[in-house]
Amino acid sequence: MKIAILSRDGTLYSCKRLREAAIQRGHLVEILDPLSCYMNINPAASSIHYKGRKLPHFDAVIPRIGTAITFYGTAALRQFEMLGSYPLNESVAIARARDKLRSMQLLARQGIDLPVTGIAHSPDDTSDLIDMVGGAPLVVKLVEGTQGIGVVLAETRQAAESVIDAFRGLNAHILVQEYIKEAQGCDIRCLVVGDEVVAAIERRAKEGDFRSNLHRGGAASVASITPQEREIAIKAARTMALDVAGVDILRANRGPLVMEVNASPGLEGIEKTTGIDIAGKMIRWIERYATTEYCLKTGG
């Protein structure tokens, strides 16, 4: 097969591993910067051009689209889809997952347990917003934040009010969430491919922090997950219509809670921690589903 990887930086670990895994299985691979793709939208002869040339047909596309370029990145991916390329995560699913409010609404509607969460835009009644999620301590986030940026733990009501007021000055959407103290700065990252959790790690925040993101210096170890956690991770990915997802789970006293569903999970931390060839599993999933039937379904 001919496979395109959409990424701004082909030197990143995840891109290199996906390329390596695809080549090992006999596929042709090209890494394309989605921002350098430009599209001819024409009912008679739509096409995608890249750096002065018309791109050939790709059997499959692996989107590694960063949050900062979600709009144009998903637009480029839609064009590949329209031309009959199988996407490892459809554009509409990626856009949905990037909308934190929409994601939580969908997960809640499916009965998937979440931390008690409130979302507001420049709330006038800060006190009521705090009460709505059960009071302090609580976590205050910018809805647009990623990798733990724009996330603050407010341990007292006064601190919570101060943080919310400061965020309100940014004219930003604010997410207020109960703090799961018993998780002790740890979460579980489940890597879902299709209908299977192929790997799971426990991420622990560095000392003095409560954010377990590996990008912020957190540590990782292999996690043994329960059947309930496995079921919830798969259900969360399926709810978001993602073939590949990183599902972050907190272990609370009342049971596992889904924190986030990531549509473009990094592979470095979880592959190096578990030793599992996740990139290879992703390529095998593509081999299974990038079929003539998909092209016929999409008109490709």
From Swiss-Prot:
ATP binds at K141, E178, Y179, D187, R211, S212, N213. Residues 104-287 form the ATP-grasp domain. This is Ribosomal protein bS6--L-glutamate ligase. Mn(2+) 2 binds at E260, N262. Keywords: ATP-binding, Ligase, Magnesium, Manganese, Metal-binding, Nucleotide-binding, Protein biosynthesis. Coiled coil: none annotated. One of its GO terms (biological process) is SOS response. HAMAP family: RimK. Pfam families: RimK, Rimk_N. The gene is rimK. Binds 2 magnesium or manganese ions per subunit. Belongs to the RimK family. An L-glutamate ligase that catalyzes the ATP-dependent post-translational addition of glutamate residues to the C-terminus of ribosomal protein bS6 (RpsF). Is also able to catalyze the synthesis of poly-alpha-glutamate in vitro, via ATP hydrolysis from unprotected glutamate as substrate. The number of glutamate residues added to either RpsF or to poly-alpha-glutamate changes with pH. InterPro entries: ATP-grasp (IPR011761), ATP-grasp_RimK-type (IPR013651), ATP_grasp_subdomain_1 (IPR013815), RimK (IPR023533), Rimk_N (IPR041107), Rp_bS6_RimK/Lys_biosynth_LsyX (IPR004666). GO terms for cellular component: cytoplasm. Mg(2+) 1 binds at D248, E260. PANTHER family: RIBOSOMAL PROTEIN BS6--L-GLUTAMATE LIGASE, RIBOSOMAL PROTEIN S6 MODIFICATION PROTEIN. One of its GO terms (molecular function) is ATP binding.
